[in-house]
């Protein structure tokens, strides 16, 4: 695999999934910048006032805390990892078997931008 991201994208995705599967938000959040911007259709549903854009690490912690309260059986299985110039995409299946792609942009080793995208069933 040719990776141009200055981190081991596969190792990152494994740590990311392990932290999520342990429901350990602080371990997930340690990889995120204080000024991170994150979008997700789930955020739009759980936090309608955000218009699906979560701004800042504190707001992201709040969103993910609420998400874990609503999805107590949350579990991710990484299917594939893609690396770009300053980005990785983690393709995974969630606890319902749904396919999700998480796009993460890095700067100085921290995620500054993230986007959760969900497969639209045909």
Predicted regions and their residues:
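A structural signal for well-ordered alpha-helical segments within the folded catalytic domains
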Residues: 7-10, 58, 98
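A solvent-exposed, acidic/Ser-Thr-rich amphipathic alpha-helical stretch
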Residues: 27, 33-79
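Hydrophobic pocket/interface hotspot
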Residues: 16, 28, 36, 56, ...
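Short, low-complexity N-terminal intrinsically disordered segments enriched in polar/charged residues
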Residues: 1-30, 34, 110, 122
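A beta-strand edge to alpha-helix "cap/lid" segment located at domain peripheries
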Residues: 1-3, 67-122
